C-alpha cells in the first residue's frame, strides 16, 4: 500500500505460492486493496505451484494476468504454460509499445479467436492436459481443493509430531508445498541418497530446510511412503546413522 500510494507504479506482480519456502500469499487481501484504492493498477500473479491445487477465483479477485506451468499441481512434465488474461490487460496491451512478438498478448488474442496458436505447441502436453482435466472433473473441483488442504494438514501434523518446525508462519502455509526447517540437524544428504535408492526423490536444496509436496497425491500414497520411509530408516540405523533415524522415527 505504501509503495502503490506514491503513484509511481502501474503494475503489481505477486507470487501466489512461493515454491522454495512454502509460503502462500493472501490474494483476498491484495484484491481488496487494489479494488478499493488502486483499480487502475494491472495485477499479475505467478501461480506456477498453486494453480490446479489451490482455489483461485481469478475473475472475482480481479486478477489481470495469471500464469502457471504444468510440472507442479497439474501433475504433468515441465514445458507447457497456462495463463488467463483480463479485458483490462488486453486493452492496455493495445496501446503499449516495444512489446516484442512472443509475449504480445494481441498476437495470442488474434489466434485464440480463431481457435489457433501462434506457433505449434507441444501436442503431447495438450493430450496429457486433457486427461488431467478429465481426472479433475471426475474427482470434482471442490473435492480437489479439499484434498490438497487435507494433505497439507496431514504433513503439518507429521512435522509437529516429530519435533520439527515449519518454515512458514501460521496463516501463510501453502496447500501444495510444505517447507520444513531442519531444526534437529538431520543429515539431509544421507537421507536423500538412501531414499533415492528406494525410489523416493527428495529435495536437497540445503541442510537448513527440506520440502514435502502436497499435490497430486492422496493420504493412501503418503501413508505408504511414510511406511516405506520407516523401513528405510531402519536400514539406515543398521548402517550406523542412528541419531538421524531415531529423529526420523520420532524417538
Could you say what each language-model-derived stretch is?
Residues 208-251:
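PLP-dependent enzyme catalytic core of the Aspartate aminotransferase-like
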Residues 165-194:
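Conserved PLP-binding catalytic core of the aspartate aminotransferase-like
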Residues 189-202, 208, 217-220:
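Hydrophobic alpha/beta core scaffold segments
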Residues 71-157:
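Active-site C-terminal subdomain of aminotransferase-like
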Residues 1-50, 65:
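Active-site phosphate-binding strand-loop segment of PLP-dependent enzymes
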Residues 164-168, 200-205:
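A short linear hydrophobic-aromatic micro-motif
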Residues 59-71:
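Conserved active-site segment immediately N-terminal to the catalytic lysine
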Amino acid at each position: 500500500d505504501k509503495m502503490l500510494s506514491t503513484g509511481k507504479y502501474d503494475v503489481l506482480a505477486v507470487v501466489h505460492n512461493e515454491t522454495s519456502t512454502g509460503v502462500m500469499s493472501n490474494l483476498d487481501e491484495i484484491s481488496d486493496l487494489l479494488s478499493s484504492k488502486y483499480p487502475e493498477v494491472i495485477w499479475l500473479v505467478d501461480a506456477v505451484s498453486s494453480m490446479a491445487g489451490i482455489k483461485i477465483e481469478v475473475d472475482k479477485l480481479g486478477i489481470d494476468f495469471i500464469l502457471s506451468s504444468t510440472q507442479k499441481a497439474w501433475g504433468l512434465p515441465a514445458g507447457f504454460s497456462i495463463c488467463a488474461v483480463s479485458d483490462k490487460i488486453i486493452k492496455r496491451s493495445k496501446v503499449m509499445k516495444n512489446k516484442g512478438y512472443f509475449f504480445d498478448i494481441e498476437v495470442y488474442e488474434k489466434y485464440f479467436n480463431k481457435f489457433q496458436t501462434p506457433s505449434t505447441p507441444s501436442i503431447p502436453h495438450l493430450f496429457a492436459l486433457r486427461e488431467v482435466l478429465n481426472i479433475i472433473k471426475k474427482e470434482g473441483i471442490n473435492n480437489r481443493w479439499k484434498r490438497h488442504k487435507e494433505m497439507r494438514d496431514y504433513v503439518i501434523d507429521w512435522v509437529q509430531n516429530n519435533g520439527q518446525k515449519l518454515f512458514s508462519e501460521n496463516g501463510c502455509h501453502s496447500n501444495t508445498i510444505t517447507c520444513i526447517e531442519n531444526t534437529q540437524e538431520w543429515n539431509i544428504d544421507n537421507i536423500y541418497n538412501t531414499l533415492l535408492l528406494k525410489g523416493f526423490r527428495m529435495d536437497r536444496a540445503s541442510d537448513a530446510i527440506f520440502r514435502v509436496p502436497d499435490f497430486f497425491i492422496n493420504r493412501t500414497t503418503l501413508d505408504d511412503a511414510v511406511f516405506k520411509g520407516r523401513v528405510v530408516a531402519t536400514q539406515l540405523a543398521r548402517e550406523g546413522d542412528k541419531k538421524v533415524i531415531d529423529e526420523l522415527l520420532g524417538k
